[in-house]
Each structure stands twice: as structure tokens, then as C-alpha cells.
């Protein structure tokens, strides 16, 4: 077995339970317990959602600026953004328009992104000229109406009367009044997904449910968003309908493109480039990444796949540790993930998940290191994907190996280095 001498740990936060830096520390402790001679580099990641400001400040240095802006429901909310040593401001849309701020009281028709515009204006007034704005983790589907209103844009109905800049009035908009002066900011939007604005893979159908939109409402809302996009194109000359990332944050990507001439880029790629990740991989033996849930959405711009692609290109195995796995998780194997290990093995509500998250990740991380110490790193280096689901209810682990040519389960075997028995079933590839 090749010794593990150089390790990179680069996870995203586990949404609602652990920040990325905490995840790093837990995995790092396990690595040090089982591979004490290994050099470990921790890179807390973010893809444009919660934790992005902290990730950049921890990795690159800088300071925080605190302010109060209008929140999702019109009430003041305290938030902050970061300023890097080169003067770039790093912001999170989620700081003033994120899902956690609603505490479960979803209201997609009336929530606003006005506070995002106020943050941008605050930065400009304080001499900032370059902004990196993360637009993940939002609670809104207003296509950036609120943000635009804060910047001086006005929206009129067919009679020329001003329309309130909230989602429930989007269908009434007939024209847009562009302000005489726009903020003089060079904005890069860090997107956590590459979702287009409309259609079956667009903002409403993909993320509407988690923001409180019923399936019955989706066709109507998708249609009104498409109609608004045509108005944008007519009055600004910017066609946002087919741009990857335009549907991020309920259409905020489209608004940033059209109203502020922003550039849309994958958030994970921006951070990996900022820390020189490709160079760090040259002497690395294995990479650990992860996020709260790995499923079909993970291939659309999330941290584990972004990290895994780079690792695969460098010939380095990449293991993903997550809270849970969902439908389509196997798709990440085609993007460079070598193995997935899931911490949640029994049905429970989120309060229990939150209560036990540190314990569960510690146990999972220790088990992964024991597996590697037992010799399985050779298999991982060979590029054979593995899914390992932890089942606390019955105390065993069930792993399955998958190949592009079919499904082949590993032979049943006991590995003495594990606290629990690892059982696998063999099935000939079809």
C-alpha cells in the first residue's frame, strides 16, 4: 500500500449543522490519529452560499465590515461582508436574503432581495470597486427585483404606474426605468449552480419547492419569469434566458447580468483558483471533500464535484464525506469522486441530525481512516468508485463498488482494522 503522506481536506459546510472549518477539523483529527506522519492541509470551501465570506477571510486574510440592511420581509437585519487584502469585497447574498433567516416561514411571493442592493451600495460608498458576490443559499425567487429597486431601477405596469418590486407583482411589470447612475462596481457573481433561468431545469422547477412554491404554482411562476426575461432583453439588450447560472438564487444571476453587467462564474472554481489548488495537488496522495447532502444537484456546481474534478485531473483519489446521499448521487463518480461515505444511517428529524452531527461525522471519519489504514487505499487509487452508507440502526456498514460497465459488489470480507464489520455482496457485472 502506498503511504499517505500528503492530505488535502476541502469540504463545504454541512448546511444548518456545521461550518466548513469545523468539518475540516473533525476530518483532520481522524487523519492525524491514523496517519500521524501525514502532512494535512485544510481548505474550508464554499460554492457561493453560506460560509463564503469566512472561507475567503480564513484562507486569504482580510477584515469584516458590519452593517444593517433590509431583510427578506422588510425588517432590518444585521449582516456583514469581507474585504480582502487587495481591496475586493466578498459578500454573501444569504447574509440578508438566505433561507435560514426565515426560520422555516417560507414566503416566496413576498420576500425581497432589496438588502443585497443595499450591501452593494454600502461597499461602493466605502471605496470598493470590485465585488465577489456569492448568490447561493437564497430564499427568494424575485429575479433580483428587490436588489434592482435598491439600486434605483423602477418597474411600471401597462398604465405607467410603479409596481412594487416583489415576486407577487412580477406579472404586472410592463416596462423598466433604468436609473441615470448605476453603481461603479466590477461584480463577479459566485454561483453555486449552473441552472438556467426558466424551463424544467430552471430556477422555479429546480429550487422552487425548497423555497415554498407548490407544484401547482410552478408553471405559472416559470411563465411569468420567462415573460420578465423578455422585458429585460427588450429594455437592456441582455438576453438572460439561456445563460448558465442565470437561474441561480431565484433569478438573481439574471438580474446581475442585466442590471449590473456582472460576470457569472462557478463559486467553487473561483475559490480553488484563489488558493492555487492545482499546484497543491502535485504532491498530494489523497483529497477529502464533502457537503451536507450529495445527490443529482451536486454535479451542477457544488463543492465536492468541483474539488473532485481537479483531483481527478491530477490523478489523486478524492473521497466525499457527507451527511446523506440522495437520488442521483452516483453521477458524481463520473465527475471525479472516488468514493462517497454517508453519516446519516437512520430516519430522524433535522433536530436529531443537528444534535448528533459532530458525533456522527467523527465516527464516520474515523471509520474511513480505518478502512484506508487496512489497505483499501490501493483500490481507491485504482479509480474504482465506492459508496459506503453508515447504518447506526443495525451497526454495520454496507459498501458497494460501481464501475461504468455495470455494478459489481465486492466480495464479502471482514477487515480487522474496523470497529464494525464491513459486509458487501457480490454481483456479476451485467
Where are these regions (language model features)?
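N-terminal loops that bind phosphate or other acidic moieties
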Residues: 2-135, 139-392, 399-401
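Short hydrophobic alpha-helical segments enriched in small aliphatic residues
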Residues: 393-395, 410
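Cationic, low-complexity basic patches in intrinsically disordered or flexible, solvent-exposed regions
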Residues: 404, 409
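Short linear motifs in low-complexity or flexible loops
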Residues: 412-417, 423-424
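Short, Lys/Arg-enriched N-terminal segments with co-localized hydrophobic residues
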Residues: 426-428
Amino acid at each position: 500500500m502506498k503511504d499517505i503522506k500528503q492530505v488535502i481536506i476541502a469540504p463545504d459546510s454541512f448546511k444548518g449543522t456545521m461550518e466548513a472549518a469545523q468539518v475540516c477539523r473533525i476530518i483532520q483529527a481522524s487523519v492525524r490519529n491514523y496517519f500521524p506522519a501525514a502532512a494535512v492541509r485544510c481548505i474550508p470551501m464554499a460554492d457561493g452560499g453560506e460560509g463564503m465570506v469566512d472561507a475567503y477571510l480564513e484562507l486569504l486574510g482580510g477584515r469584516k465590515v458590519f452593517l444593517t440592511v433590509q431583510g427578506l420581509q422588510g425588517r432590518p437585519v444585521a449582516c456583514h461582508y469581507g474585504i480582502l487584502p487587495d481591496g475586493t469585497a466578498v459578500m454573501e447574498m444569504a447574509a440578508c436574503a438566505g433561507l435560514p433567516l426565515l426560520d422555516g416561514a417560507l414566503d416566496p411571493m413576498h420576500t425581497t432581495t432589496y438588502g443585497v442592493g443595499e450591501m452593494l451600495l454600502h461597499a461602493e460608498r466605502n471605496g470598493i470597486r470590485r465585488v465577489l458576490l456569492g448568490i447561493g443559499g437564497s430564499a427568494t425567487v424575485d429575479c433580483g427585483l428587490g436588489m434592482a429597486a435598491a439600486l434605483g431601477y423602477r418597474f411600471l405596469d401597462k398604465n405607467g404606474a410603479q409596481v412594487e418590486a416583489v415576486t407577487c407583482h412580477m406579472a404586472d411589470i410592463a416596462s423598466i426605468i433604468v436609473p441615470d447612475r448605476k453603481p461603479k462596481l466590477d461584480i463577479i457573481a459566485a454561483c453555486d449552480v449552473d441552472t438556467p433561468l426558466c424551463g424544467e431545469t430552471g430556477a422555479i422547477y429546480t429550487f422552487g419547492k425548497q423555497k415554498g412554491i407548490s407544484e401547482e404554482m410552478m408553471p405559472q411562476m416559470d411563465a411569468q419569469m420567462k415573460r420578465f426575461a423578455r422585458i429585460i432583453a427588450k429594455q437592456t439588450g441582455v438576453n438572460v434566458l439561456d445563460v448558465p447560472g442565470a437561474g441561480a438564487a431565484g433569478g438573481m444571476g439574471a438580474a446581475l447580468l442585466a442590471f449590473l453587467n456582472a460576470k457569472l462564474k462557478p463559486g467553487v472554481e473561483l475559490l480553488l483558483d484563489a488558493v492555487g489548488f492545482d499546484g497543491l495537488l502535485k504532491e498530494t496522495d489523497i483529497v477529502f471533500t464533502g457537503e451536507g447532502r450529495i445527490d443529482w444537484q451536486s454535479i451542477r456546481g457544488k463543492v465536492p464535484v468541483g474539488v473532485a474534478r481537479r483531483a481527478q485531473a491530477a490523478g489523486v483519489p478524492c473521497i466525499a464525506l457527507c451527511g446523506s446521499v440522495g437520488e442521483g448521487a452516483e453521477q458524481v463518480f463520473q465527475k471525479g469522486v472516488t468514493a462517497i461515505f454517508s453519516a446519516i444511517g437512520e430516519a430522524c428529524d433535522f433536530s436529531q441530525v443537528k444534535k448528533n452531527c459532530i458525533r456522527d461525522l467523527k465516527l464516520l471519519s474515523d471509520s474511513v481512516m480505518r478502512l484506508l489504514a487496512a489497505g483499501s487505499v490501493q483500490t481507491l487509487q485504482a479509480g474504482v468508485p465506492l459508496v459506503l452508507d453508515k447504518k447506526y440502526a443495525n451497526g454495520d456498514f454496507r459498501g458497494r463498488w460501481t464501475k461504468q460497465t455495470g455494478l459489481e459488489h465486492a466480495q464479502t470480507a471482514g477487515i480487522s482494522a474496523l470497529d464494525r464489520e464491513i459486509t458487501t455482496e457480490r454481483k456479476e457485472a451485467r
